[in-house]
UniProtKB/Swiss-Prot annotation:
Alphabetized GO MF terms: amino acid transmembrane transporter activity
Cross-referenced PANTHER family: GABA PERMEASE, THREONINE_SERINE TRANSPORTER YBXG-RELATED
Annotated protein name in UniProt: Proline-specific permease ProY
Family that this chain belongs to: Belongs to the amino acid-polyamine-organocation (APC) superfamily. Amino acid transporter (AAT) (TC 2.A.3.1) family.
Species this protein is from: Salmonella typhimurium (strain LT2 / SGSC1412 / ATCC 700720)
Source taxon at top rank: Bacteria
Gene Ontology terms: cellular component: membrane; plasma membrane
Membrane-spanning intervals of the chain: 18-38, 39-59, 96-116, 117-137, 157-177, 198-218, 243-263, 278-298, 332-352, 356-376, 400-420, 425-445
Cysteine-cysteine disulfides: none
Membrane topology per record: Multi-pass membrane protein
Role noted for this protein: Permease that is involved in the transport across the cytoplasmic membrane of proline.
Periplasmic topological intervals: 178-197, 264-277, 353-355, 421-424
Cell compartment(s), UniProt: Cell inner membrane
Length: 456
């Protein structure tokens, strides 16, 4: 099946732009936003703006290195080259584990969503179906993957735009509200804009940043981009404003139509908005959207882990068999391994006690922030490693240079502190540090084996 170990560049600027955009629009917006609103009130809008700025800093740092050295293993390779082999090893495996956990949640969610329409069909049938379908998609050419991901993301984005436009119609003209405009007074009528104080807004930041998780896939696409020097900068520069529009715009509409303390209490914010327009089948519309979102997420999950493991295998941080590719340039071994892992993980998800799964899911939050911190540290070390003339010649530099990166780093450390401060998420720090210790033990055994092979 395999012909060599090379990936093929088949992703266009259009594919990469929508992949980067779609990766940050998922359950964090469709469901997680309700919890963030409860925590911060209307000031959650400010939290999403602050989080968007931090996400942009992370993307620019990754983009600077990706344009200079496009690699499928992306931030794992950059960590290895700039911080050392151990940093690359831990970062790569932590990212893979993070995405696997997220993928477990996504495939399980797909079964639940389909159960809304077909309650008599067991969920495991839908879960098995979507895993096999996504596996087949990822075994095709990367161009097919990119095209499907483009349309998945397109449907998500189109639905959000329709909801924002419809919401503005309710706010300004009272469409669907008996001709009575709702206005925007709900943003300050129920306890003020900072209804839960500054602390409420600050505490919501950890949830906001998790909602932006997935943006780092833009770096992984660099290894298969046709023209990374053009496509990566265009994708990165276009995404932040769009994300801010979709998140901030959507929540602005929702909280203008409904008092913030009622959002999420009688159903999904998206369902409530459509129902307010007089659309009785709002639940089905939302269900189609979240189904598309979960398909997009699973598709990107398998793609991301496959490319990361392929790159790590080439670096010597993962088994060499993961470096094998098909004639189409697809890392088929990693795709099959991810598929098998998903099938086994879905089974575990059904038999696992709820609190245990919460612990594992919490690790994804820690792992996301960990990967972002390693990206920023790698960029700082990358800049220090280059002579001044090469720094000046960089084609996609971070605005403000290392100073901006350090500011982003301080912010992420603050997010980790928030995770530890909040009782519901504190356990993720314990589990996260335990994961790092396990990787360190694995690294020790790996180095010992490498020395033995070198002496043989």
């Amino acid at each position: 099946m395999e012909s060599n170990n090379k990936l093929k560049r088949g992703l266009s600027t259009r594919h990469i732009r929508f992949m980067a955009l779609g990766s940050a629009i998922g359950t964090g917006l469709f469901y997680g936003s309700a919890d963030a609103i409860k925590m911060a009130g209307p000031s959650v809008l400010l939290a999403y703006i602050i989080g968007g700025v931090a996400a942009y800093i992370i993307m620019r740092a990754l983009g600077e290195m990706s344009v200079h050295n496009p690699a499928a293993s992306s931030f794992s390779r950059y960590a290895q080259e700039n911080l050392g082999p151990l940093a690359g090893y831990i970062t790569g495996w932590t990212y893979c584990f993070e995405i696997l956990i997220v993928a477990i949640a996504d495939v399980t969610a797909f079964g639940i969503y389909m159960g809304v329409w077909f309650p008599a069909v067991p969920h495991w049938i839908w879960v098995l179906s979507v895993v096999l379908i996504i596996c087949a998609i990822n075994l095709m050419s990367v161009k097919v993957f990119g095209e499907l991901e483009f349309w998945f993301s397109f449907f998500k984005v189109a639905t959000i735009i329709i909801m924002i436009v419809a919401g503005i119609g309710i706010i300004v003209w009272g469409i669907g509200n008996g001709g009575q405009p709702t206005g925007i007074h709900n943003l300050w009528s129920n306890g003020g804009f900072f209804s839960n104080g500054w602390l409420g807004m600050i505490m919501s930041l950890q949830m906001v940043m998790f909602a932006y998780g997935g943006i780092e896939i833009i770096g992984i696409t660099a290894g298969e981009a046709k023209d990374p020097e053009k496509s990566i900068p265009r994708a990165i520069n276009s995404v932040p404003m769009r994300i801010l529009v979709f998140y901030v715009g959507t929540l602005f509409v929702i909280m203008s139509i409904y008092p913030w303390n009622q959002v999420g209490t009688n159903g999904s914010p998206f369902v409530l908005t459509f129902q307010h327009m007089g659309i009785t089948f709002a639940a089905s519309i939302l269900n189609f959207v979240v189904l598309t979102a979960s398909l997009s997420a699973i598709n990107s999950d398998v793609f991301g882990v496959g490319r990361m493991l392929h790159g790590m295998a080439e670096q010597g941080s993962a088994p060499k068999v993961f470096a094998k590719t098909s004639r189409r340039g697809i890392p088929w071994v990693t795709v099959l391994v991810m598929t098998i892992a998903l099938l086994f993980a879905v089974y575990l998800n059904y038999i696992m006690p709820e609190n245990v799964f919460l612990v594992i899911a919490s690790l994804a939050t820690f792992a996301t922030v960990w990967v972002w911190i390693m990206i920023l540290l790698s960029q700082i070390a990358f800049r220090r490693r280059l002579p001044p003339e090469e720094v000046k010649a960089l084609k996609f530099k971070v605005p403000g240079g290392v100073v901006t990166t350090i500011a982003g780093l301080i912010f992420l450390v603050f997010i980790i502190a928030l995770i530890g401060y909040h009782p519901d998420t504190r356990i993720s720090l314990y589990v996260g540090f335990a994961w790092i210790v396990l990787l360190l033990i694995g690294w020790i055994f790996k180095r010992r084996r490498d020395r033995q092979l070198a002496q043989a």
